Amino acid sequence: MKIDIHTHILPKEWPDLEKRFGYGGWVQLQQQGKGEAKMIKDGKLFRVIQQNCWDPEVRIREMNQKGVTVQALSTVPVMFSYWAKPKDTLELCQFLNNDLAATVARYPRRFVGLGTLPMQAPELAVEEMERCVKALGFPGIQIGSHINTWDLNDPELFPIYAAAERLNCSLFVHPWDMQMDGRMAKYWLPWLVGMPSETTMAICSMIMGGVFEKFPKLKVCFAHGGGAFPFTIGRIAHGFNMRPDLCAQDNPSDPRKYLGSFYTDSLVHDPLSLKLLTDVIGKDKVMLGTDYPFPLGEQEPGKLIESMAEFDEETKDKLTAGNALAFLGLERKLFE
């Protein structure tokens, strides 16, 4: 069994949001025919996507070809829209979540849903989380690595974490809103370097901000193998112990205490990196994640995990399925 915790999906179409809300900044989808569409933001091309980004039947065909049993579906992060008026973001979230729920309902043995929330308005976010879990049946939510000027340790977000604990709703943290200009303008650096940096900052903010202390039952997964965190934990812990006046302002506990307290996906593209990741984060906390259907994703799902001579069959099964089932709070028999 292979459960892919990190995949993205969009509706085939959605309303003209600029006309709907009266201001720009929104992403629109322009279908081009022949299984291709353009994501357009304020008249500029953001990304060209293929039919597998909106058509569940195409996805299932490709899943069957690659041996993937289940995909956890989440929106494309550019759709988060945390910058917008909260009620407008809520309306978009409801549209995206309803579309996602309809796809899961059609293929409940192949897909599970990770919803999206208006995180800039925590009260509305909690209400939509309740709906996602209780009405739509989602086991989790995808959130950004920061919410406008809030890092993930901001007390404004604590009601969301409290609700997630109460509802047993898992959180999948995805980097987004990287610097795109200046020194980052060339070489795809926002995706190659910016995303790992964003994820590392998100992990550090939750650790040093005491989030895992305040919400010990919170289940959190960080995308892209936790970014640079597994490689830099030595520097982070050393800095914490050398300069507690700077690093221990909100949490006196050594960052190493929290290794094993959160999950990451496996998307590191390198056997040495995957070995380090499982050594640092724990073999019980790393889950297969591919970033399907995008080019930076793992094109052969699970191939890297299966190639690891250091991993026994029990470990490989944990990484490809068992850990995801634990993270999502689901039983294997639902998908067998």
From Swiss-Prot:
Substrates-to-products reaction catalysed: 2-amino-3-carboxymuconate 6-semialdehyde + H(+) = 2-aminomuconate 6-semialdehyde + CO2
Binding site for Zn(2+): 6, 8, 174, 291
UniProt entry keywords in alphabetical sequence: Decarboxylase, Lyase, Metal-binding, Zinc
GO biological process: L-tryptophan catabolic process; negative regulation of quinolinate biosynthetic process; quinolinate metabolic process
Transmembrane spans: none
GO cellular-component term (any): cytosol
SUPFAM superfamilies reported for this sequence: Metallo-dependent hydrolases (SSF51556)
Superkingdom assignment: Eukaryota
InterPro entries referenced in this protein's UniProt entry, alphabetically: ACMSD, Amidohydro-rel, Metal_Hydrolase
PANTHER family found in the cross-reference section: 2-AMINO-3-CARBOXYLMUCONATE-6-SEMIALDEHYDE DECARBOXYLASE, 2-AMINO-3-CARBOXYMUCONATE-6-SEMIALDEHYDE DECARBOXYLASE
Assembly, per entry: Monomer.
Function field: Converts alpha-amino-beta-carboxymuconate-epsilon-semialdehyde (ACMS) to alpha-aminomuconate semialdehyde (AMS). ACMS can be converted non-enzymatically to quinolate (QA), a key precursor of NAD, and a potent endogenous excitotoxin of neuronal cells which is implicated in the pathogenesis of various neurodegenerative disorders. In the presence of ACMSD, ACMS is converted to AMS, a benign catabolite. ACMSD ultimately controls the metabolic fate of tryptophan catabolism along the kynurenine pathway.
Family classification: Belongs to the metallo-dependent hydrolases superfamily. ACMSD family.
Protein name: 2-amino-3-carboxymuconate-6-semialdehyde decarboxylase
Organism: Mus musculus
Lineage of origin: Eukaryota, Metazoa, Chordata, Craniata, Vertebrata
